[in-house]
Amino acid sequence: MSNATAGWPGWILGAVALTVAPVTSLPGVFPSSAEAASTEGVRPAATTALGHERGPLLVAHRGASGYAPENTVAAAQAAAGTGTTWVETDVQRTSDGELVLMHDTTLARTTDAEEVFPDRAPWRVADFTAEEISRLDAGGWFGEEFAGEPVPTLEDFLDELDDNRQKLLLELKSPSLYPGIEAEILEELGDHGWLREWYPGQRVVLQSFEADSVRTVHELAPRLETGFLGTPPVAEIPEYAEFADQINPRHADLTEEYVASVQSVRGPHGRPLKVYTWTVNDGELANRVADLGVDGIISDVPDVVRAALRP
């Protein structure tokens, strides 16, 4: 997707110009306020492809990255194989404006960029075109059986999740490096029908470590559910609740008191804030954070966590 604004929907252009025409007014994307009223107070059930979760909702971290190379189509397929509906992944932007999945801001750790482009250090995602990134192997580092697995575009990943009937927790990775990426992501999601839900949080949630980016997403798409990654001081939680529906800390930073304090505050949609924690990969830890009252657990091995959680 190009950075050029030619051909952008009017709602995106209006929002970027800060004459914000709310996304709620876009026909076919979000319901009207009246249409949504009957569901406004309803908290979505924690479900997987296999049925209802018991306890915290489980999210496959970067796909089921314990079983396949992170942030690839193979990882989404692995998550589906574990019966996990919600998939977390990270999105960045190439030099020519394509949205691609990558956790690090450089390509070196999870691709063969150093071999393919030896003179392009430090191999920043933002310095490569989509075509150049498409030449890279994003799977061989994980295992020979994944050699040749490509870096997916966001479009490719959405298509895979659609095929698998999965849902998306999408992290905007270092969005300050990519001005305007929030509107571009929303445009991509809208083009692929991911915002056509009575309550979009039932299918897609956008999160980031950068509060300004989360706020921007909320301003552009106020019905969309958002999350802030981190552990804000309890006294500041009401400020975050103006634009974030989730506060998502590292598991090491959690206490029962902190979780309860977050959940006592209502977010921008009038529902209690939720707490999703990361990255939890063993049963003992999973039960500890579940006992703290978290709403969700993000894991590389969600099936292991699911099997270990006490009923």
Please name every model-derived segment.
Residues 2-17, 21-311:
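Phosphate-group recognition and catalysis centered on beta-loop-alpha active-site segments
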